[in-house]
Structure formats: C-alpha cells, structure tokens
C-alpha cells in the first residue's frame, strides 16, 4: 500500500490549470445550448435568477444531459423550519414541493436521496414532490444504504431496493449507488454488504434489465475499496462515482483526517477512466460557507458581489468530468444562491484556482475538527448533541474565541463568547461532560473522527475556561 501511495498519479498544478481552461470552454458551450442569451455577467446579481441558463453536463455512457447543480434531499425542511435531519419534526412537504418546483423551473433535473436520509423519510417526500412532474423532466439518484448488519442479507437488501422504487413512485431508478463504500471496516464490510450476499450481481442484472439506468458508488474512508472498484471498472462498467471534493479537501483531506483521501487523487483516478464524478460536500458540511472572518474578507475583496459559498461551488463545477455538484438546500435562499452560481457557471480562471489554493493553505492554519454535521453519529445513547458541540467549538475557533491563556488580550470577551455560546447552542444535559466514552458514535463517522477524544478535550477546555485557565 505504501508503494501504491507513492506511485499515485495525482494531477500536477500545470495539468490542473489546463483542466480548468478546458472546463471553461466546455461549460460555456453547454450553457449556450441550454439557454442562449447573454454571457451570464449578471450571474452574481442578487436581483436576477435566470430560468433558462443552467449549465449542463452530458454523461458519456448514457447520454443524460444533467444539470450541474444537483439537489441533495438530505436536509429537507421540517415544519419547524429547521432541516429534517435535526430533531423529530416532520418534513414540511409543502415547502419541499415548492423547492422542487422552483428547482425544476430553473433547470435543475438531478435529485439525490437515500433510504437513510431524514430519518428514513426523504425518499417518500422526494417521490411525492417529483411525481407531480413528467418523468422525463428529472433524474432520481438513490442508494442501497444497507449499513446495519441486519440489512446485509440478500433478502433485506433487495427489500430495501424494492422499497426505494415504491417510495419514489417510479418503476426505474436513473442513478443507483452502493452507499458509502469504504466506511466501517473497509474492504471486509464492503464484501459483506455487496459481494458475499450477491447484491452487486443483482444490481448489475437490474441495470441490464433497465430498472437501473446508471450504476455507481459513493466513497468514504478506506481508499483500498475505492481502488479495488476502479481496478474492476472493465468488469463493472461504473456509470458514475460520487466523491467528496472541495477546494480544502483537494490537497488537505488526508492531513485533516488520515482516514480520508485527497480529492485530487480521487478525481484524477476517475478522469483516467472517463468515469463521470458526482460531487458531494462541496461546502465541506457548511465549513466553506462559514469561514473565518479573515477568509471572508479575502474572498469579498476579490469578488464583492459573490457569496462565500459560491467560490466552493465554482471550484467543484469548473472541473471537466464533473457531472453534477450536490447541495442540500433547506431554504429557498440556498437554492437561489446556487442557481446564480450555476445558471450559468462562471468557470474558474487559472488565477482563481491559485487564489483558492492559497486560501485553502491559510484555512489549514485553523485547527478545526473535521465535522460535516452529517449526524451519522446520532442519536447518542446518553443524549449528547455531538454535532452541535463540535460545530460550536469550530465556530469559536474560526472567530478567534478559543483563548489559550488568561493573558490573551481578548481573554474576557472570548471566554464569555465561548461559554455563553456553548450554553445557548447545546442544552446542559447534552454537553460534552455527559460523554462516557462508549464509542458507539465513532464507528459511524464518515470522517473517522475520534469523537469521545474530541468531546473530552472540549469538556476539559470548557472547565479550564470556567476556572480562568
């Protein structure tokens, strides 16, 4: 494995810059085909949301013309106004319908869901919203999310797949993924979930029968599984692969977490095989839209009218071979901002790419915890709100409110911001001091965070702050 790491053919900086140039030409051409009209100079304008300027990419194996912006149905709105991933509130179906209608009216045609999303209710909500539109107006992507050992049998996995068809109200699935390969115990778990039970063979047969139009996988964790599946591409003929990619993970994913793999390598391997890439976590779980103030100022100085988040979406969308970039859009303003970015796309220039790489290097000086707020660690058997604790710490770190000493110039202000904000963000009975170290959370974390260790560290730090350090 060490030799393999040394020999990995990642893109050189020069190759990437050539790639960016090619992507710009391709994006411009596809946009012109999609809508015509002006050059898209007003894409960043808060006043305009073009309805006919979406950028599209064509899947080379199926010919599907897919919107560069994909709607991730993981963070659907709840009746209480929050994401339905949080708490026990019901999905706001009326708002989901409104978001889907608006997205389709503005050129979005790729909708990504899973049996695991929104406490098992995302597929049904997605099916209700999309079934109100002609079937040829959208592509549905869902996953075989057989994470629990109880679902590893052939019968249970087939039942999950059949239920997806029922919940989505369709007789075929446009894009079906093996969900989260590389997680857990890596190769051993992959074999148990998909190979030993014959499920991968079953899915290949479903593709031949036309009930699955495109078959792929989403990857987290053990890169040996990723490499294994690509090495057998001639046999499996993957139609697409979903990877985590953003301007921070491009070169720093492994430094952030040794379990992860730099997006530059993942993307490069797909490009070598001409496999379309579907991008998840373009904002790194929101971290790239909630950056430190110094980074906000840096981005705004370069492009005052563009949102902070749009930089991350432009980075992912500017790469050739990227079929669609997923965004979980809970509110209409999220959808509208992303539409301004991709309708049409203003591809990165070579200078933009260098600028973002320098920005990423600056961000790496902040020692944040790589939590993406995916909530796979929840629920905690002891009631902790794990993501809220980790995200509060990151927020304070980004804002300069994690003092190291009582002698720090802003100690009193930072101490108050951390402790008062902690109590406001996380109820006392759900804070880090309740962690007993059972470790039931860590095994579910796609980022492989040692969650008990981080919780104990944050709790110890909060106690030191209370004592005046």
Regions found by a protein language model. Name each.
Residues 66-70, 110, 137-141, 172-175, ...:
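Structural preference for beta-strand elements that scaffold enzyme active sites
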Residues 133-154, 179-182:
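Structural motif corresponding to the early beta-alpha repeats
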Residues 89-103, 153-167, 223-230, 309-313:
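Short, acidic/polar
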Residues 2-138, 202, 208:
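N-terminal binding-site loop/beta-alpha segment at the start of enzyme catalytic domains
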Residues 59, 71, 111, 126, ...:
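Conserved, mostly hydrophobic/aromatic
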Residues 156-176, 205-209:
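CE4/NodB-like, metal-dependent polysaccharide N-deacetylase domain
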Residues 354-378, 412-437, 456-469:
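Ferredoxin-like iron-sulfur electron-transfer modules
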Residues 181-391, 395-414, 443, 453:
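Beta/alpha (TIM)-barrel catalytic core signal, keyed to glycine-rich beta->alpha loops juxtaposed to Asp/Glu
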């Amino acid at each position: 494995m060490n030799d393999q790491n040394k020999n990995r053919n990642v893109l050189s900086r020069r190759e990437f810059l050539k790639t960016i140039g090619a992507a710009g030409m391709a994006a411009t051409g596809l946009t012109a085909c999609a809508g015509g009209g002006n050059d898209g100079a007003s894409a960043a304008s808060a006043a305009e949301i073009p309805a006919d300027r979406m950028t599209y990419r064509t899947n080379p194996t199926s010919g599907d013309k897919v919107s560069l912006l994909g709607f991730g149905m993981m963070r659907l709105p709840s009746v209480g106004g929050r994401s339905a991933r949080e708490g026990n509130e019901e999905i706001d179906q009326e708002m989901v319908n409104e978001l889907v209608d608006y997205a389709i009216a503005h050129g979005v045609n790729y909708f990504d869901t899973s049996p695991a999303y929104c406490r098992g209710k995302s597929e049904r909500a997605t099916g209700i919203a999309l079934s109100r539109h002609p079937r040829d107006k959208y592509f549905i992507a869902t996953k075989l999310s057989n994470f629990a050992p109880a679902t590893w049998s052939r019968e249970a996995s087939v039942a999950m797949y059949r239920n997806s068809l029922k919940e989505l109200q369709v007789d075929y699935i446009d894009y079906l993924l093996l969900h989260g390969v590389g997680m857990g115990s890596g190769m051993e778990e992959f074999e148990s979930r998909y190979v030993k039970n014959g499920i991968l063979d079953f899915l290949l047969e479903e593709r031949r029968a036309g009930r699955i139009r495109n078959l792929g996988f989403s990857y987290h964790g053990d890169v040996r599984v990723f490499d294994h599946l690509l090495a057998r591409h001639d046999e499996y003929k993957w139609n697409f692969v979903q990877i985590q990619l953003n301007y921070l993970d491009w070169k720093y994913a492994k430094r952030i977490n040794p379990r992860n793999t730099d997006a530059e390598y993942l993307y490069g391997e797909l490009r070598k095989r001409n496999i379309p890439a579907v991008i998840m976590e373009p904002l790194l779980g929101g971290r790239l839209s909630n950056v430190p103030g110094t980074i906000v100022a840096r981005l705004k100085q370069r492009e005052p009218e563009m949102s902070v988040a749009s930089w991350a979406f432009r980075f992912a969308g500017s790469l050739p071979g990227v079929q669609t970039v997923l965004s979980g859009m809970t509110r209409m303003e999220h959808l509208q901002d992303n539409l301004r970015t991709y309708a049409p796309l203003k591809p990165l220039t070579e200078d933009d790419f260098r600028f973002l790489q320098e920005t990423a290097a600056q961000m790496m000086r902040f020692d944040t915890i790589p939590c993406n707020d995916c909530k796979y660690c929840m629920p905690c058997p002891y009631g902790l709100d794990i993501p809220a604790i980790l995200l509060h710490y990151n927020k304070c770190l980004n804002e300069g409110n994690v003092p190291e000493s009582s002698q720090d110039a802003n100690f009193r202000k930072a101490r108050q911001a951390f402790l008062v904000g902690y109590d406001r963000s996380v109820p006392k009975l759900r804070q880090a001091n309740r962690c007993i170290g059972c470790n039931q959370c860590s095994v579910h974390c796609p980022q492989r965070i040692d969650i008990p260790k981080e919780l104990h560290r944050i709790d110890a730090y909060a106690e030191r702050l209370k004592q005046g350090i």
